[in-house]
Amino acid sequence: MNSMTSAVPVANSVLVVAPHNGYPVTPGIMSHVPLYPNSQPQVHLVPGNPPSLVSNVNGQPVQKALKEGKTLGAIQIIIGLAHIGLGSIMATVLVGEYLSISFYGGFPFWGGLWFIISGSLSVAAENQPYSYCLLSGSLGLNIVSAICSAVGVILFITDLSIPHPYAYPDYYPYAWGVNPGMAISGVLLVFCLLEFGIACASSHFGCQLVCCQSSNVSVIYPNIYAANPVITPEPVTSPPSYSSEIQANK
């Protein structure tokens, strides 16, 4: 092959020039093999990229976002467990003439389950920060948790707004569960408001991590090592001819 063979650089690759005539070439060292007329250097694409050629990601903001996401995820797990626990207690006060739309819809249980799952993924994302699927799943579930908490806020406000004719157990002893039920709904309302803020903050940090990871493209500056440099020979003066020497002697 007499013509120069070129390879288009792709991601995770290094360009190295190798001689056509088979002389060994050490990367980074200039070869002193002379260039022959019919032997031109070839460009080969060698897989792999040196560590010094990869652009590093700003690790400090990423680690900060991961730690904050882990803390918020732990709080989400606690809120989810509180929803399930208080929902179980609410089941005991329904016999006391307390009407709870949120309980009949099952929100304290499936809402708390969503909060626990999203919080668990936020904690797991801190342990595996380079897992794109885990970060994306955590982001999606945090968005779902934010929507669920907004629905919970509406349901618990509705529970507290429903007029209960038997709100005075002194006059209606069989309506003892109204006041405890309203207290539980009020506590769950506060937890839903807290969960909404945490889920929105976790979604914000998750968007930052996903965007940072998707934009983390390795920038490679290919180095071309000259295998057979072209050396221009210095002009050499030709020796005097025999006839010129005879004339000089005369």
Curated annotation (Swiss-Prot):
Family the UniProt entry places it in: Belongs to the MS4A family.
Name of the encoding gene: MS4A8
One GO CC annotation: plasma membrane
Matching Pfam families: CD20
Keyword annotations from UniProtKB, A to Z: Membrane, Receptor, Transmembrane, Transmembrane helix
Stretches assigned to coiled coil: none
Transmembrane stretches, start-end: 75-95, 99-119, 137-157, 181-201
Protein name (database record): Membrane-spanning 4-domains subfamily A member 8
Segments on the Extracellular side according to the record's topology features: 96-98, 158-180
Top-level taxon of origin: Eukaryota
Tissue expression pattern: Expressed by hematopoietic tissues and cells lines.
Membrane topology qualifier: Multi-pass membrane protein
Protein role: May be involved in signal transduction as a component of a multimeric receptor complex.
Side Cytoplasmic, residues: 1-74, 120-136, 202-250
GO annotation terms (biological process): cell surface receptor signaling pathway
PANTHER family the record matches: MEMBRANE-SPANNING 4-DOMAINS SUBFAMILY A MEMBER 8 (PTHR23320:SF155), MEMBRANE-SPANNING 4-DOMAINS SUBFAMILY A MS4A -RELATED (PTHR23320)
Native organism: Homo sapiens (Human)
Location within or outside the cell: Membrane
Keyword Heme in annotation: no
